[in-house]
Amino acid sequence: MEYQYPLDYDWSNEEMVTMVKFYEAIEKAYEKGIIREELMGLYRRFKEIVPSKAEEKKIDKEFQEVSGYSIYRAIQRAKEVEEQKLVKM
């Protein structure tokens, strides 16, 4: 996609790379599907970078505005899917 991901310039380069991978995984869940463990592993790393619920909601809102994809909905779907199954929105 051709849009700018929500990034915090206080994050380290490694954290920014992780966040971009996480955003790409959310896109993949919507566009093609992604293995549950891959998405949940990136979500766990996302939560290490963004531990605050309020900040998570803010990032989700910003991401949804630029992409049309909801982080919250994708993660909720992943939690419902069995292990080793595809998460597809």
From Swiss-Prot:
InterPro entries: BH2638-like_sf, UPF0223. Gene3D superfamilies: BH2638-like. Pfam families: UPF0223. Coiled coil: none annotated. Belongs to the UPF0223 family. HAMAP family: UPF0223. This is UPF0223 protein BC_3961. The lineage of its organism: Bacteria, Bacillati, Bacillota, Bacilli, Bacillales.
